[in-house]
UniProtKB/Swiss-Prot annotation:
Expressed in roots, stems and leaves (at protein level). The gene is SAMS1. GO terms for cellular component: cytoplasm. Belongs to the AdoMet synthase family. This is S-adenosylmethionine synthase 1.
Length: 396
């Protein structure tokens, strides 16, 4: 590749599990998991908000499950590491408010006919449009800028919890800028331009120690050496002080980190959040199947990069539209790829739930609620399974 090649910079960010918005996502999904574990037909729309010494869960839940919401809130906070006021929240002594009502009967009869409908007849839980995206620039078929930002956040938590960096506290943010080359519509990462980490810390540590530890224990194990050079810029706790964090530092809300949850600013987003929603909510199940479709297209060699959009009307099972764009990287025309996608994937919400096994609780959704819903190597992330697509390579 010539040195004078045209490149551009693209940035993705992430936050780790102690960020107040992410804390809320995890509580909402922990509630969903608990409901589905006892009653797979649970209808859940659970929101969470938090501020100093307070967590509130609110929303609409119709379930046969017997769920202790307060216990789930405290356990989730505890597991993240919010065990005292000085780290941002005290799981055992904070105030927990619960305002949960039943799903509106108007919505219930329109979506699932009060549970009288067969799975293929279940309508979408709401209107909306969702996107799935995939790119061949990483083994996960995800954007590199997003993958690196996400892995830095996960690694920050790992070295906090295993004691490698005892000065760390739960809250933290990461951001990675990658220099790319556009190869006829496909994205080719050349180098990491900038790495930014802002992490909550205790009073004992100096900024120099923070920078040294982050380079050695967080950045080095995560970012492959081939992407770093002498020109790579590092901003490590650039504000100079981040002792107050978690809900004490900022208020948190479910559904405020939807780009971090998906593709780090690549592709597109229909605006609907994931956490705290059961699979009849197409904001979640639609985005999951759209990712599976896009990933399968790239994995099959049909394209190097791809976006899939689907849209729904409330109460209607079939999608209103399906759209595929391969950014000019398709081996066959996009309209032919679209035909293959429509033949291979069942976009009806009830069938998505069955085909991707989305009615299973446990800690399944809690796992998705931090460090991204896509590109994860975990059997519970069923939408990451590539479906084989039948197509003929065009004759040269």
């Amino acid at each position: 590749m010539a040195a004078a090649v045209d490149t551009f910079l693209f940035t993705s960010e992430s936050v780790n599990e102690g960020h107040p918005d992410k804390l809320c996502d995890q509580i909402s999904d922990a509630v969903l998991d608990a409901c589905l574990a006892q009653d797979p037909e649970s209808k859940v729309a659970c929101e969470t908000c938090t501020k100093t010494n307070l967590v509130m869960v609110f929303g609409e839940i119709t379930t046969k499950a017997n769920v202790d919401y307060e216990k789930i809130v405290r356990q989730t906070c505890r597991d993240i590491g919010f065990v005292s006021a000085d780290v941002g929240l005290d799981a055992d002594n904070c105030k927990v408010l619960v305002y949960i009502e039943q799903q509106s009967p108007d919505i219930a009869q329109g979506v699932h006919g009060h549970l009288s409908r067969r799975p293929e007849e279940i309508g979408a839980g709401d209107q909306g449009h969702m996107f799935g995206y995939a790119t061949d620039e990483t083994p996960e078929l995800m954007p590199l800028s997003h993958v690196l930002a996400t892995k830095l956040g996960a690694r920050l938590t790992e070295v906090r919890k295993n004691g490698t960096c005892p000065w760390l506290r739960p809250d933290g943010k990461t951001q990675v800028t990658v220099e790319y080359y556009n190869e006829n519509g496909a994205m080719v990462p050349i180098r990491v331009h900038t790495v930014l980490i802002s992490t909550q810390h205790d009073e004992t540590v100096t900024n120099d120690e923070i920078a040294a530890d982050l380079k050695e224990h967080v950045i080095k194990p995560v970012i492959p050496e081939k992407y770093l050079d002498e020109k790579t810029i590092f901003h490590l706790n650039p504000s100079g002080r981040f002792v107050i964090g978690g809900p004490h530092g900022d208020a948190g809300l479910t559904g405020r980190k939807i780009i971090i949850d998906t593709y780090g600013g690549w592709g597109a987003h229909g605006g609907g959040a994931f956490s705290g929603k059961d699979p009849t909510k197409v904001d979640r199940s639609g985005a999951y199947i759209a990712r599976q479709a896009a990933k399968s297209i790239v994995a099959a060699g049909l394209a190097r990069r791809c976006i899939v959009q689907i849209s729904y009307a409330i109460g209607v099972p079939e999608p209103l539209s399906v759209f595929v764009d391969t950014y000019g990287t398709g081996k066959i025309p996009d309209k032919e790829i679209l035909k293959i996608v429509k033949e291979t994937f069942d976009f009806r919400p009830g069938m998505i739930a069955i085909n991707l096994d989305l009615l299973k609780g446990g800690s399944r959704y809690l796992k998705t609620a931090a460090y991204g819903h896509f590109g994860r190597d975990d059997a519970d992330f069923t939408w990451e399974t590539v479906k084989p697509l039948k197509w003929e390579k065009p004759q040269a």
